[in-house]
Amino acid sequence: MRVMRIKRTDSSFTIDGFRINPKYRYGSYTRNDNDGPRTYNVKDRKVPSVTTILSATQSPEKKRTLENWRNRIGHEEAARITNQAATRGTEMHYVLEHYMNGQGYLNLGDNGVQPRMMAHTIVDNLEKLSEVYGTEVSLAYEDQWAGSTDLVCVYDGKPTIADFKQSNKPKREEWIEDYYYQIAAYSLAHKKQYGEITQGIILICTKDLLFQKFMMSEQLLAKYEEKWFARVEDYYKRSK
């Protein structure tokens, strides 16, 4: 990662060539993780998270694939791999969030080195990032769903929802459809609450520091927004 260079101008400031611009006054919603599936407190209601809806509407095929993997390597080993990946992802997100906000973050523990290098790899591939509107942005679509997206920004001149992902191995596009659904859900909520989004981007770094970028054009985003509405409808039908 480059040495952070900050230049302040009125209410915004520039870091390494991109501008932090508080264009929107983003609110925040508290998250509930301890009483069943994840929800967010939106006004006076508990609203299901995007990941809760995705999990509840998984296809039987995807559920079988996950269960077969657990059975093949053993449930204890599967839990260890899952927990390691979650810890690595959390640390990587901390580094990226602080960098995008013009702050420093450094975990000197053994579990901080690899995620920091992964975050640096992602940052070094953000040459088309020109503005940051917000990080860890809380979004809700009325009382239908809520969640937090990693980054709302201007990328390659277009208002963009971006998500950072860690991975144990390189991804094929057919493996990341749930990521497309997440971007679509956040895009719809942002349009409803704040302003236009015309593309999505998923930025992945593996534990071996392989970088991948998956772009969602305006057309692909619109396609998955429609598909997301269908998933939400299915979720609420199942919940009755």
Mark where each language-model region is:
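Metal-dependent nuclease catalytic cores that hydrolyze phosphodiester bonds in DNA/RNA
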Residues: 1-146
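Mg2+/Mn2+-dependent nuclease catalytic core
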Residues: 134-239
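DEDD superfamily 3′-5′ metal-dependent exonuclease/proofreading module
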Residues: 2-7, 20, 156, 160, ...
